[in-house]
Amino acid sequence: MEKLDRLLERIEPASKDWEAKAWERLHAQIRPRDSLGRLEVIAARLAAIKRSLTPAVGRKIIFTMAGDHGVAAEGVSAYPQEVTAQMVGSFVRGWASINILAVHCGAAVRVVDCGVASDLPPDWPVLRRKLGKGTANIAVGPAMSREVAVRGLTIGAEIVQDAHLKEGYLLFGTGDMGIGNTTPSTAIIAALGGKPVRDLTGRGTGIDDVAFERKVRVIERALAVNRPDPNDPLGVLAGVGGFEIAALGGAVLGAAALRVPIICDGFIATAGALVACRLAPKAADYLFVSHRSREVGHTAMVDMLGMRPILDLDMRLGEGTGSALAMNIVEAAAKVLVECKTFEEAGVTDTGH
């Protein structure tokens, strides 16, 4: 807990002064004021994060956090649990959607075993940070102890910090893999937001009506059994969360402590980000939500964060796919701020509009 406390103490708000300087330059550039819309908002936020009018994006990396869930035994997913490890195999071979999109945007992909139920082959190039072989079943008790939840958060933070300080990565993205993980993610928002479970529950991997009703009942039972306190985000994570969700939240905290931008993917990654921002509200200054997931509860999560997603493409895959697509937009925003000339620099008449 001491390590987590030190991490939280290091998180400072982004600079309002540098954000104001960025807006001054953006409004002086050779185009009608605000004509690049939200791209300019992203650019100003990057300046605030980096405390610079030349915020470098540079090397990009996506961490796909993988973990299994005891609640999968309740039949809440259309896929069996062994698919988690099988998909990790696809990631490391470069076969999956995240691999294709990451190559397109020029980002590295690194898979992290936070708690896959099986032992992965030793020759697979994954970061091995296993907290256990899947969480306990949240429908009958807590997913993990508070101590393990803290370890998950610190692991996520350390992964980002190592990639930044030792390898020079400057823009981070998060993604997930874990059969059944929309169930704990839904439980997290229900616990933190106090909204009815049915209004937040989606179809995940494509479950039918019978499985959907079962999923709603399972989440309601998990909340009744664990009684998570919305004012205790660490307790919520331990009670109804997941190992990879903890690491996803920790990644946000780690990026914020380093003052580097991080993009979260969809439903599961945003659940981790929400926990992080409840633990350290200032961490939200460093966070971008990549896209609006088709999972029904995602809008509630984004609203709780007070953010607007960069993209809205009806995606619901996870893996980090939304982060990959959003990275190029974030990079484009930085380039507009840095490279576009002002009216004065270009010798163009400014009408002030």
UniProtKB/Swiss-Prot annotation:
Pfam families: DBI_PRT
Record keyword Glycosyltransferase present: yes
UniProt EC number: 2.4.2.21
Gene3D superfamilies assigned: 1.10.1610.10, 3.40.50.10210
Annotated active site: E319
CDD domains: DMB-PRT_CobT
Database matches in InterPro entries: Nict_dMeBzImd_PRibTrfase, Nict_dMeBzImd_PRibTrfase_bact, Nict_dMeBzImd_PRibTrfase_N, Nict_dMeBzImd_PRibTrfase_sf
Sorted UniProt keywords: Cobalamin biosynthesis, Glycosyltransferase, Transferase
The keyword Phosphoprotein is annotated on this UniProt entry: no
GO MF term set: nicotinate-nucleotide-dimethylbenzimidazole phosphoribosyltransferase activity
Listed HAMAP family: CobT
Protein name (record): Nicotinate-nucleotide--dimethylbenzimidazole phosphoribosyltransferase
Source organism: Syntrophobacter fumaroxidans (strain DSM 10017 / MPOB)
